[in-house]
A protein has these predicted regions:
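Post-transcriptional modification and biogenesis factors for structured RNAs
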Residues: 1-199
Length: 199
């Protein structure tokens, strides 16, 4: 059985959808506070449909509480931290029964200190470079070049949202996947690698 961990999720419908995915795959859902909603929120339950009452879900007071109650260390080999900042893709990882797939909040992802403490456990879902996937890509590439910044410079990062998307207040577009979609992609790869147990 796999474990889906949502660190500070903010959008109730995403958590409801992920809960539904957990039920139909036999995964456990772990919610690390703070949550951006109440679990009694009708949007959570609506997104989970009739599955919510069958969900194995645990809520934690914070990251340390989550680690302690599950007998994990910050860089435990059972942890897989999903972030756009990783070099290794999720498909390059090996998943084993009982692993924890950790996803950050919709607006800010997994906090930098947690990523730094487990840098070898970080994975990403491949996507087009942000500037390649945006309609205004050429304008933003030219803007960055005119400022003399590379995509890794501090100034360039400050003009990106937490997922690395360039922010143009007059023409904002998003090139990151939805949290629920991201969770399903990685969970089903883990299930594929383990032979879809019980399915």
């Amino acid at each position: 059985m796999f474990n889906i961990v949502l660190y500070a999720p903010e959008i109730p419908a995403n958590t409801g959808n992920i809960g539904r995915t957990c039920v139909v795959t036999g995964a456990c859902l772990h919610l690390v506070e703070p949550l951006g909603f109440s679990l009694d929120d009708k949007t959570v339950r609506r997104a989970g449909l009739g599955y919510w009452q069958n969900l194995d879900v645990t809520t934690y007071a914070g990251w340390e509480d989550f680690l302690a109650r599950n007998g994990l260390s910050p860089a435990d080999e059972r942890l897989h931290l999903l972030t756009k900042k990783a070099r290794r893709t999720y498909a390059q990882s090996t998943y084993r029964d009982g692993d924890y797939l950790v996803f950050g909040s919709e607006s800010s992802g997994i906090p930098e200190p947690l990523l730094a403490a487990a840098s070898e456990r970080c994975e990403r879902i491949p996507m087009l470079r942000d500037c390649d996937s945006l309609d205004n890509a050429e304008a933003w590439e030219a803007h960055e070049e005119s400022l003399g910044h590379t995509e890794d410079s501090h100034e360039a990062i400050l003009r990106q949202d937490i997922c690395g998307n360039f922010i143009d207040p007059d023409d904002y577009r998003i090139s990151a996947l939805n949290l629920s979609n991201s969770t399903a992609i990685v969970l089903y790869e883990a299930l594929r690698q383990t032979g879809f147990p019980g399915m």
